[in-house]
Design a protein with these regions (language model features):
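HAD-like aspartate-dependent phosphatase fold
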Residues: 1-307
């Protein structure tokens, strides 16, 4: 294989590319046998590829740097599709508006959201610090939230800006509080905390009046119910958090009331595969690799989440 690894200037026309999973395909904590050589071969032969993973919680740039170091081959941010990377493509819809970003640790979720172009980003820590009595069970987490809080962005009326969308970037660490926040906003008037829409429960309106009053849209990025950790059994992941929210939503609403305006990306959703395909096509065009892509091969190890 080493004889085939030349410089990246050897770029014959290719009309195919690869989307590669990481865990179980390229590495298991450390690179699997021949993973590094395979990526080097793709690079030297001018074959476009991207890393498609349900990991998240850090900026695409930081993930790309980590992959570059791990696999000893240059991987740019454009070659990385994390679970939340498709959020980048909807950021323009919220220009000048305020979003709630949930999940992950410390302030990393805020950094990720801002790297995608969201102008005004609020986290659960910001809200709990500004309105301590919004969550009565903060004894174990209050210090953590205060350490990671920033002031709430204010609107021209002197009040906190309304929340126009909720983005779950990674599995939340404070489930109870985050579930409360999301539910509060989904039944609010226009995405303003501390309000409740007068339309809720009106059976003469669509969806029994719920989410008919300017409430925020809701975005999830990883449908996995469980994931592998050092513990001997799988642990709950973001998909389980979404299921918990759906259970709460259904528990006290009139029969047939749906949770509307919910967007889901992350493997194996169509949105994530389309995002990967668009990125590969841009890489193909940017690097002058000849004809447009005709095929993209997905390499994974779990049909339930990779296909």
């Amino acid at each position: 294989m080493s004889d085939a690894i030349a410089g990246p200037e050897q770029t014959p026309n290719r009309n195919f590319g690869f989307a590669l999973d990481v865990d179980g395909v390229l590495s298991k904590k450390t690179p699997l046998p021949h993973a590094i050589e395979t990526l080097q071969l793709l690079h030297s032969q001018g074959i476009p590829y991207c890393i498609l993973t349900n990991s998240g919680g850090v900026k695409d740039e930081d993930r790309a740097m980590a992959f570059t170091k791990q696999f000893h081959v240059p991987i740019s941010p454009e070659m990385v599709v994390q679970s939340h990377t498709p959020f980048l493509e909807v950021a323009g819809q919220y220009k000048g508006k305020c979003i709630l970003a949930l999940g992950g640790i410390s302030s990393k979720v805020r950094e990720v959201a801002r790297s995608y172009g969201f102008d005004h980003v609020v986290t659960g820590s910001d809200i709990l610090t500004a309105v301590p009595n919004i969550w009565p069970f903060a004894e174990a987490t209050e210090a953590y939230h205060k350490a990671n809080a920033q002031p709430l962005p204010m609107g021209p009326d002197g009040h906190p800006m309304p929340i126009s969308a909720i983005f779950v970037f990674a599995t939340p660490r404070d489930w109870g509080f985050d579930l409360q926040l999301i539910h509060d906003l989904l039944v609010s008037h226009g995405g303003r905390l501390g309000t409740r829409s007068a339309f809720n429960g009106n059976t003469a309106l669509p969806n029994n009046g719920f989410q008919q009053d300017g409430q925020p849209s809701l975005f999830f990025c990883n449908p996995d119910i469980e994931w592998a950790t050092p513990y001997c059994e799988p642990r709950f992941a973001q998909g389980a958090f979404k299921a918990a929210l759906e259970g709460i939503w259904a528990s006290d609403k009139p029969q047939g009331t749906r949770m509307l305006n919910v967007y889901q990306c992350g493997k194996p959703t169509t949105e994530s595969y389309k995002c990967a395909e668009r990125r590969l096509s841009l890489l193909q065009k940017r690097d002058g690799r000849g004809e447009p892509l005709q095929r993209v091969y997905m390499i994974g190890d779990n049909p339930a989440s990779d296909i």
